[in-house]
Amino acid sequence: MTLYHFVGIKGSGMSALAHILFDMGETVQGSDIEKEFFTEKSLREKGITILPFNQENIKEGMTIIAGNAFNDDHEEIVRAHELGLTVTRYHDFLGNFMSQYTSVAVTGSHGKTSTTGLLSHVMNGDKKTSYLIGDGTGMGMPGSEYFAFEACEYRRHFLSYSPDYAIITNIDFDHPDYFASMSDVFNAFQEMTKKVKKAIVACGDDENLRDIEADIPIYYYGFKEDNKVVAKNMKTTPQGTQFEVYIDGELFDTFVTPMYGDHQVLNALAVITICHLEGLDNAAVKHALSTFGGVKRRFSEKIQDEQILIDDYAHHPTEIKATLQSAHLKYPERKVIAIFQPHTFSRTSAFLEDFANSLKLADKVYLCDIFGSVREDSGELTIGDLQILIPGAELINESNVNLLKQYKDAVVIFMGAGDIQKIQVAYENLK
């Protein structure tokens, strides 16, 4: 039996893929840095071994799956090559894996993880669907007909995939350490559409997506009347958001999602469109949509005393704005307190003023030091450069989280793609 060894198993995509292979009966282990990540708990609960990086982890007969963050000079990858083992990059392995299913890629600059989670949940309401979500969640179901997966545009990794369908949520400038400009980002998505086999489902309210050209049908969804699939008559209730869906100008049905915010309705429209194209039972789709509980680190809520604590992955100005708007919609009577940790110096520099403007939607802002990525450990920029752009913003770390106690009955949101969770944990552990 093949033993799959994951180099960088704690990465969100890597851990999800490890779950999938394990669920399908494969033997799986992996290695990573010793720092704790939110993906670890579920891996360990399945009995999947997680080792610290060491070339001695690599043995004869293993198949190596390497995370995209680790170069060929990594000690374990070097050792694998010395032993003549097959080393496959995450995105290449995933590209080959999906060929056995009717596959749906979910991509876009924002909203990939939430939409993939929703898609997998809703499709499973009618058809067996295996899935890989960017929150570290994955499920390999024997006998699955469908495979729903998150496809990241970073470094054009999504060009390794040839899915049957693709959902594109939006196109926005991000990853300034790789993409040179907005046109560079657009060109990457344009390249990706050429790899899709059956159809593209895209947000027609996004002007950039209207410029996409494809040799297959593009089904546009959104709030504007010129889309094929349109959401109308939205109503916000304590239970979520209700909306009507029109297809080609005709009322299709009324749906309810437990989520809040325009972006959540757009995500739902994308999923409804895919299910409609594939002929899934609409009653099952409606029920599943109404029972969606969200995904990890995307508006993940818990109650502590009188406060609502929210953990969210938002790390781009567009995402921060959407998260804060959702909080105000769901809890209109409460103050919203934002604790934000910028992720990467390059992104912070590129979007400095945009970060400041989006964070101003909060009633109070606290900032953490910038979190550098594996590829970028330092920069000339400091968190003070962002702080001065936000009136009343203060700095916070694990030693002064008691500052948050003063906001009785508030919504306290911890946002970022780094290790912002350590701030929330420190706050929750206050005596």
Swiss-Prot record:
<feature type="binding site">
    <location>
        <begin position="108"/>
        <end position="114"/>
    </location>
    <ligand>
        <name>ATP</name>
    </ligand>
</feature>
<dbReference type="GO" id="GO:0071555">
    <property type="term" value="P:cell wall organization"/>
</dbReference>
<keyword id="KW-0067">ATP-binding</keyword>
<dbReference type="InterPro" id="IPR050061">
    <property type="entry name" value="MurCDEF_pg_biosynth"/>
</dbReference>
<dbReference type="InterPro" id="IPR000713">
    <property type="entry name" value="Mur_ligase_N"/>
</dbReference>
<dbReference type="InterPro" id="IPR013221">
    <property type="entry name" value="Mur_ligase_cen"/>
</dbReference>
<keyword id="KW-0131">Cell cycle</keyword>
<dbReference type="GO" id="GO:0005524">
    <property type="term" value="F:ATP binding"/>
</dbReference>
<comment type="pathway">
    <text>Cell wall biogenesis; peptidoglycan biosynthesis.</text>
</comment>
<comment type="similarity">
    <text>Belongs to the MurCDEF family.</text>
</comment>
<dbReference type="InterPro" id="IPR004101">
    <property type="entry name" value="Mur_ligase_C"/>
</dbReference>
<dbReference type="GO" id="GO:0051301">
    <property type="term" value="P:cell division"/>
</dbReference>
<keyword id="KW-0133">Cell shape</keyword>
<dbReference type="GO" id="GO:0009252">
    <property type="term" value="P:peptidoglycan biosynthetic process"/>
</dbReference>
<keyword id="KW-0547">Nucleotide-binding</keyword>
<dbReference type="GO" id="GO:0008360">
    <property type="term" value="P:regulation of cell shape"/>
</dbReference>
<dbReference type="Pfam" id="PF01225">
    <property type="entry name" value="Mur_ligase"/>
</dbReference>
<dbReference type="InterPro" id="IPR036615">
    <property type="entry name" value="Mur_ligase_C_dom_sf"/>
</dbReference>
<comment type="function">
    <text>Cell wall formation.</text>
</comment>
<dbReference type="Pfam" id="PF02875">
    <property type="entry name" value="Mur_ligase_C"/>
</dbReference>
<protein>
    <recommendedName>
        <fullName>UDP-N-acetylmuramate--L-alanine ligase</fullName>
        <ecNumber>6.3.2.8</ecNumber>
    </recommendedName>
</protein>
<keyword id="KW-0963">Cytoplasm</keyword>
<dbReference type="GO" id="GO:0008763">
    <property type="term" value="F:UDP-N-acetylmuramate-L-alanine ligase activity"/>
</dbReference>
<keyword id="KW-0961">Cell wall biogenesis/degradation</keyword>
<dbReference type="InterPro" id="IPR005758">
    <property type="entry name" value="UDP-N-AcMur_Ala_ligase_MurC"/>
</dbReference>
<dbReference type="Pfam" id="PF08245">
    <property type="entry name" value="Mur_ligase_M"/>
</dbReference>
<dbReference type="GO" id="GO:0005737">
    <property type="term" value="C:cytoplasm"/>
</dbReference>
<keyword id="KW-0573">Peptidoglycan synthesis</keyword>
<dbReference type="InterPro" id="IPR036565">
    <property type="entry name" value="Mur-like_cat_sf"/>
</dbReference>
<keyword id="KW-0132">Cell division</keyword>
<keyword id="KW-0436">Ligase</keyword>
